[in-house]
């Protein structure tokens, strides 16, 4: 039977999660857990709550960003600095399976709801702490954002097509999501399985910097094999190869070209009318030819032409085009969240 993640909406049925996190990484993680059927209760402080509520643009209620990553959750307000409210939270933790937090290290302990306090009430509890640099180490108390985690993970230094220019920022928060939320989801699922075996919970230490650094596994393989360290704009997949890049079309939009393998490059050349011959210019000649020929048609014209040639070329879509694209529409990727 074929399933998608949305088909697994009951996989975590019966798992109770208390979510103390704010902004993006923690709420995105608990959104995944909620989508999988977990009962997620978002716990917010009574005054400001989750700062993402106020992110623009917004209408009369919370921002769209907040509503998206906090779907399928219940919400309560609770002041953990108040003795009675803290006790209320600890009583909730007695019946919970998972607690998620994204404070700086030691904040949970100072509030009286750290792992020892939680474990004292419920030895099966799983506490997942998401932070920029980990719960220990020399950077544990430093403030940071996605750009900083990517910088120290080496991901930012590898990003960008211009070897002589500055690193390029991605369009999404790679460390927050790929380095934090996704690794945390995997760790929680593993901890739940391990608890079935041992009967005991655990404290998960998720560093977004380390999670992002783990994405460089193949690059470190290159470091071991090559005499020089890979740099941005020179590698096969980050701008150094003409057959793997982005090219402007006649309407000012862009086409992604990923014709890495010879068969795909051959099909691309045949489709656009290029004759591939080894020459003194090498890759620079190919880049120049592709730049010139792709600029002769619009993005959508090329998309229609190249779709018939199976050559790993696709249009670069903007956000407002995504819901109506045939791929996402037919797969049911987008759906409305009821008020």
Regions found by a protein language model. Give the residues of each.
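Active-site-adjacent beta-strand anchor residues
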Residues: 79, 101, 206-209, 257-258
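Polar, surface-exposed loop/tail segments
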Residues: 198-214, 321-324
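Residue-level detector of beta-strand structural context in well-folded domains
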Residues: 65-67, 204, 245, 335
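Oxidoreductase and adenylate-handling cofactor-binding alpha/beta cores
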Residues: 153, 180-201, 214-226, 267-274
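Terminal low-complexity tails and localization/encapsulation signals of metabolic enzymes
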Residues: 2-16, 231, 248-250, 270, ...
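N-terminal helix-loop segment corresponding to the beta1-alpha1 unit
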Residues: 1-187, 191-197, 231, 337
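A short glycine-threonine-serine/GTX helix/turn-capping micro-motif
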Residues: 168-179, 201-203, 234-235, 242-244, ...
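Aromatic-enriched alpha-helical interface/lid elements that frame and gate functional surfaces
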Residues: 238-313, 320-321, 326
